[in-house]
Amino acid sequence: MSSTIPLAWYLMLSAFLFICGVIGFMIKRNIITIFMCIELMLNAVNLTFVAYATELRSLSGHIFVFFVMVVAAAESAVGLGIIIAVFRSRETLNVDRVNLLKL
């Protein structure tokens, strides 16, 4: 990326962020926390795309990150709408207590 920070450091940071997101997704039971962990994983992938695109002096990685961010924004809007609907009907955000097959 730059002359002072090698590509490997960016990739290690991206891997660390992705692993934190996966661990949070697996351990946490709150729907909003799980949603934030998914967004953290998306941002880790975006960091990897930007790091490789800058290292290879390519614009395609930056453009792909832009599209991923647009899709993530749409996903956030739809996901939060679903979370609000689930909370209104079940009055909880705990994944273990939310069973949409029961009335």
Curated annotation (Swiss-Prot):
<dbReference type="GO" id="GO:0050136">
    <property type="term" value="F:NADH:ubiquinone reductase (non-electrogenic) activity"/>
</dbReference>
<keyword id="KW-0812">Transmembrane</keyword>
<keyword id="KW-1133">Transmembrane helix</keyword>
<feature type="transmembrane region" description="Helical">
    <location>
        <begin position="7"/>
        <end position="27"/>
    </location>
</feature>
<keyword id="KW-0830">Ubiquinone</keyword>
<comment type="function">
    <text>NDH-1 shuttles electrons from NADH, via FMN and iron-sulfur (Fe-S) centers, to quinones in the respiratory chain. The immediate electron acceptor for the enzyme in this species is believed to be ubiquinone. Couples the redox reaction to proton translocation (for every two electrons transferred, four hydrogen ions are translocated across the cytoplasmic membrane), and thus conserves the redox energy in a proton gradient.</text>
</comment>
<dbReference type="GO" id="GO:0042773">
    <property type="term" value="P:ATP synthesis coupled electron transport"/>
</dbReference>
<dbReference type="GO" id="GO:0005886">
    <property type="term" value="C:plasma membrane"/>
</dbReference>
<keyword id="KW-0520">NAD</keyword>
<dbReference type="InterPro" id="IPR039428">
    <property type="entry name" value="NUOK/Mnh_C1-like"/>
</dbReference>
<feature type="transmembrane region" description="Helical">
    <location>
        <begin position="31"/>
        <end position="51"/>
    </location>
</feature>
<keyword id="KW-0874">Quinone</keyword>
<feature type="transmembrane region" description="Helical">
    <location>
        <begin position="63"/>
        <end position="83"/>
    </location>
</feature>
<keyword id="KW-1003">Cell membrane</keyword>
<dbReference type="InterPro" id="IPR001133">
    <property type="entry name" value="NADH_UbQ_OxRdtase_chain4L/K"/>
</dbReference>
<keyword id="KW-0472">Membrane</keyword>
<keyword id="KW-0997">Cell inner membrane</keyword>
<dbReference type="GO" id="GO:0030964">
    <property type="term" value="C:NADH dehydrogenase complex"/>
</dbReference>
<dbReference type="GO" id="GO:0048038">
    <property type="term" value="F:quinone binding"/>
</dbReference>
<comment type="similarity">
    <text>Belongs to the complex I subunit 4L family.</text>
</comment>
<comment type="subunit">
    <text>NDH-1 is composed of 14 different subunits. Subunits NuoA, H, J, K, L, M, N constitute the membrane sector of the complex.</text>
</comment>
<protein>
    <recommendedName>
        <fullName>NADH-quinone oxidoreductase subunit K 2</fullName>
        <ecNumber>7.1.1.-</ecNumber>
    </recommendedName>
</protein>
<keyword id="KW-1278">Translocase</keyword>
<dbReference type="Pfam" id="PF00420">
    <property type="entry name" value="Oxidored_q2"/>
</dbReference>
<keyword id="KW-0813">Transport</keyword>
